[in-house]
Amino acid sequence: MLTRFAPSPTGYLHVGNIRTALICWMYTRNQNGKFLLRFDDTDLERSDIKYVDNIIEDLKWIGINWNSSFKQSERFERYNEVFLQLMKEGHIYACYETREELDTKRKLQLKQGFPPVYDKGALLLTEQEKIRYEQEGRKPHFRFKLDRNKTVKWNDEVKGEINIATIHISDPVVKREDGIYTYMLPSVIDDIDFNVTHVVRGEDHVTNTAVQIQMIQALKAKIPIFAHLPLLHFDDSKISKRKGGLDIKSIREDEIESMALTSYLAKLGTSDPIEAYIDMQSLIDSFDIKKFSSASLQFSLSEMYKLNSKVLQQMPFEMVQDRLSQIGSEFWYFIRSNIEKFSEVAKWWKICKFGIEPVVLNKEFIKIALSTLPQGDCNENTLSEWVKNIRQTIDIKAKDLFMQLRLALTGTETGPELAKLLIFIGRESIIARLEESQRIIQKV
């Protein structure tokens, strides 16, 4: 088994792109196959090396590796060779219509109630007419001649049996007036030359597949197995509020763990429940392309954020040790169940070890809290003893008491379990924070 992921280096990878790459890669690894990374950069003007680098970085971040890679821009000689072969055999023909002329044809067809399918008019041109057009300065574009008397059929791994009547499809342009190859032909040539056995991509390529199957047949090559995944639909109202939308670069900047995104995308649209995974191999082992539904899918940001928190909760210290600097395992195992993003670890470490901005609270409460703090090092019983001592001294609701203590010691109204926080803050620092609050109150 050999599959490929073929991004165009004309922009950042999007969630939809990375989902296709991930499913293709897991399918391959589950079957002990090989995975090929191909950069579709035939349009040299729009392609940029910075996007090549970024795509590689994003794929590595999510955990995808590959057995080999190449750029289509390295294979123009091969594409020219096959192009000339197909032209010689009558499968490709030159067209001289301008964009304006083609647009006029389309509008007329629609007005007459016909589908806007190219009429193959260029096939009727005489050699003299072609020469005249070229003398006028017209540069030809080239189309692949579809056999419109055939219905292309294949058994799709996700969508089941598909039948496409090519009579409803325009002969595709394979080479533009400026000499640049479009997506269609180079992709087919590469799949044949590199022995690609399975093609996994979005369902927006279904019509392309029908066209490419006829190209493969024209080249007398073996047709690969196809799997067309349903496209993701997004909640635009939520995504519009995100800087960068849903490209992988912005998701990484938003501190989504790679395994959170992987856990979500690998199971979205399958019969399996969406759960938090912390190792890729478990996802690979449970992968089955037949579990994917052909129904449309909704991508939920809130679901991904929930998974992010669950992934962090499951991560052992060894997985995060190199990201924690001087923070030890004890603090990690305490804090991981109370965070949504990894950066919150440093935030709470700072609160525990480096103090806070003093919070102005009730003067009497601070005085009593100081005088009733249990002696000795803080332990898991310190908070309950302290609360008992305070309530024996003043009449205060438990909810208000906890809120006052949390504000005085952490500067926040919410956070991790206070009883355990006291252990990391330490008795000395607790006293210092309460005394600082006292000094602030006296100045007010």
UniProtKB/Swiss-Prot annotation:
Top class in the EC scheme: ligase
Keyword Metal-binding applies: no
Localization, UniProt: Cytoplasm
Pfam families (alphabetical): Anticodon_2, tRNA-synt_1c
Residues the record lists as binding ATP: K241
GO molecular-function term, one example from the UniProt record: glutamate-tRNA ligase activity
Keywords: Aminoacyl-tRNA synthetase, ATP-binding, Cytoplasm, Ligase, Nucleotide-binding, Protein biosynthesis
Domain of life of the native organism: Bacteria
Motif ('KMSKS' region): 238-242
GO cellular component annotations of the record: cytoplasm
EC number: 6.1.1.17
HAMAP family: Glu_tRNA_synth_type1
Subunit field text: Monomer.
PANTHER family listed in its UniProt record: GLUTAMATE--TRNA LIGASE, GLUTAMATE--TRNA LIGASE, MITOCHONDRIAL-RELATED
Protein name: Glutamate--tRNA ligase 1
Provenance organism: Wolbachia pipientis subsp. Culex pipiens (strain wPip)
Lineage: Bacteria, Pseudomonadati, Pseudomonadota, Alphaproteobacteria, Rickettsiales
